[in-house]
């Protein structure tokens, strides 16, 4: 039987001592509960319904108080299915908000919104729990220094660098390498920063969540034989779960990440897939609670709910939480209130391109569409900024010339444009990189490339020093020295074929 951290953690008085109420009304996932006078629970308190249904099966439903209605009644939203509940059933006020296990014991495990393990690996050996509703760090605790969060991925570090303690939007459809990019980031932060990661699956497909778990085990991000050596904790609230669970699962994942930042003083990577589903679940709950909808049917508290989640993701003097959030854009409408509210919080955007993926260039990050507020001379320095701008200019010129090349051919271009195209094609291939987590699939050893090495490599291509090397030499290599070595190998192979 699963142990609920909210009701079983140390310091929580036994259920018999708590105030009890009765279910008055059930409308889908929303319960109205009547309590004795003077015994009303607070907003966000967890309520538990423990009973037997008509089929003689055990019911254990946790709810969260959302409204105080008057006449000793409260309205709560269920975190699991309300099947089998009946009016008149007893409801226990736990006297505290939902609390979840935190710390090293959560690594390598899968949890639901209540912090209960759902991976059949037994209970979690963690005495520490945190409530999921917490305040954002105080102004005095925030680290205001703007610093780059080095990922070891060339295209990200050079053209759309991440901010330490920042928020990044990850835009990508199915099959363009989003999962592999996520796993590589989890792997690299563990190796380069000694950090850990938390993955929050908010309203995602159960199949995708299972696939991610299996791929993480295959690539070593989750160490099945020695679970303590795993680098990530997973928290899932899938599409089939009630809106209350999908609305709160992001906070559960964030709470686990906050412990690593505040207590263990680590750099944490927090993935939220998908932030749109968080908004969507909030919209459903808002309608169920009877609030008047706002623009496009969204909840009137959209900005407040988004802000309360996003403001907790910050860099403090103890450590940092850097968040990468997958953003679904409904009907590709960027003015839709859900993505528009999300954009206001983002420091960088990483756009994955199907066109690049079809060319076999991985990671398929679009170098022209991806942006970052960190790419400024005063933050990254003149050398980095100028190199990035020249790379973008070269790629942009190549993009403009592609139509002419398709119609008239490469020979019709001027000498200068032919040189630009040759360098752009080398740059495009040099932006690809072998990943550690893809070693088992590709047979190529993964590469972590430091920022200084990345800048040096692109400067050499732009300066024309490597014009004599074939473009294949730049494909799927780490630093620029490997490209030179690969060119020699390719030349020897060609000679031996002749």
Curated annotation (Swiss-Prot):
<keyword id="KW-0375">Hydrogen ion transport</keyword>
<dbReference type="InterPro" id="IPR050053">
    <property type="entry name" value="ATPase_alpha/beta_chains"/>
</dbReference>
<dbReference type="Pfam" id="PF02874">
    <property type="entry name" value="ATP-synt_ab_N"/>
</dbReference>
<dbReference type="GO" id="GO:0046933">
    <property type="term" value="F:proton-transporting ATP synthase activity, rotational mechanism"/>
</dbReference>
<dbReference type="InterPro" id="IPR020003">
    <property type="entry name" value="ATPase_a/bsu_AS"/>
</dbReference>
<dbReference type="InterPro" id="IPR055190">
    <property type="entry name" value="ATP-synt_VA_C"/>
</dbReference>
<dbReference type="Pfam" id="PF22919">
    <property type="entry name" value="ATP-synt_VA_C"/>
</dbReference>
<dbReference type="GO" id="GO:0005524">
    <property type="term" value="F:ATP binding"/>
</dbReference>
<keyword id="KW-0406">Ion transport</keyword>
<comment type="function">
    <text>Produces ATP from ADP in the presence of a proton gradient across the membrane. The catalytic sites are hosted primarily by the beta subunits.</text>
</comment>
<dbReference type="InterPro" id="IPR000194">
    <property type="entry name" value="ATPase_F1/V1/A1_a/bsu_nucl-bd"/>
</dbReference>
<dbReference type="GO" id="GO:0009535">
    <property type="term" value="C:chloroplast thylakoid membrane"/>
</dbReference>
<keyword id="KW-0813">Transport</keyword>
<dbReference type="InterPro" id="IPR003593">
    <property type="entry name" value="AAA+_ATPase"/>
</dbReference>
<feature type="binding site">
    <location>
        <begin position="172"/>
        <end position="179"/>
    </location>
    <ligand>
        <name>ATP</name>
    </ligand>
</feature>
<dbReference type="InterPro" id="IPR004100">
    <property type="entry name" value="ATPase_F1/V1/A1_a/bsu_N"/>
</dbReference>
<dbReference type="InterPro" id="IPR005722">
    <property type="entry name" value="ATP_synth_F1_bsu"/>
</dbReference>
<keyword id="KW-0934">Plastid</keyword>
<comment type="subunit">
    <text>F-type ATPases have 2 components, CF(1) - the catalytic core - and CF(0) - the membrane proton channel. CF(1) has five subunits: alpha(3), beta(3), gamma(1), delta(1), epsilon(1). CF(0) has four main subunits: a(1), b(1), b'(1) and c(9-12).</text>
</comment>
<keyword id="KW-0066">ATP synthesis</keyword>
<protein>
    <recommendedName>
        <fullName>ATP synthase subunit beta, chloroplastic</fullName>
        <ecNumber>7.1.2.2</ecNumber>
    </recommendedName>
</protein>
<dbReference type="GO" id="GO:0042776">
    <property type="term" value="P:proton motive force-driven mitochondrial ATP synthesis"/>
</dbReference>
<dbReference type="GO" id="GO:0045259">
    <property type="term" value="C:proton-transporting ATP synthase complex"/>
</dbReference>
<dbReference type="GO" id="GO:0016887">
    <property type="term" value="F:ATP hydrolysis activity"/>
</dbReference>
<dbReference type="Pfam" id="PF00006">
    <property type="entry name" value="ATP-synt_ab"/>
</dbReference>
<keyword id="KW-0067">ATP-binding</keyword>
<keyword id="KW-0150">Chloroplast</keyword>
<keyword id="KW-0472">Membrane</keyword>
<dbReference type="GO" id="GO:0005739">
    <property type="term" value="C:mitochondrion"/>
</dbReference>
<keyword id="KW-0547">Nucleotide-binding</keyword>
<dbReference type="InterPro" id="IPR024034">
    <property type="entry name" value="ATPase_F1/V1_b/a_C"/>
</dbReference>
<dbReference type="InterPro" id="IPR036121">
    <property type="entry name" value="ATPase_F1/V1/A1_a/bsu_N_sf"/>
</dbReference>
<keyword id="KW-1278">Translocase</keyword>
<dbReference type="InterPro" id="IPR027417">
    <property type="entry name" value="P-loop_NTPase"/>
</dbReference>
<keyword id="KW-0139">CF(1)</keyword>
<comment type="similarity">
    <text>Belongs to the ATPase alpha/beta chains family.</text>
</comment>
<keyword id="KW-0793">Thylakoid</keyword>
